[in-house]
Amino acid sequence: MKRLGINIDHIATVRNARKSSHPDPLVAAKYAIKCGANSITIHLREDRRHIKDLDVIRICKEKKIPLNLEISLNHKILKIALKNNPNYICLVPENRKEITTEGGLNLSKNLNKIKDIIIKFKNKNIRTSL
């Protein structure tokens, strides 16, 4: 079965560029689901360049919106994810100098840390991918 996930990061990019509360990522997420999307993807970056902590909180509270939260291995970001219980977590590399995610996770360097993170999410019934 084909499933459609919509990434709404750039809704937040426009909002932040306008220094406004609009467009609202939560409204965009609800609209995407209403129009047939199966899930929403957002990336909470360490620098918060688009999605903010409050966006994660608000979207996670909407249980009708299946959320795939992309996060780095940063402990502060992990705490936010664990506290808000998204449906899915995708662990992604992050480099502050990059414009968008480039490359992959260094599994050999971070294997034990990644294993520990996956166990934490599994214990909360949050599916995790790399």
Model-flagged regions — what are they?
Residues K76-I77, K83-L130:
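Conserved anion-binding
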Residues M1-K76, L82-N85:
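Conserved N-terminal beta1-alpha1 strand-loop-helix module at the mouth
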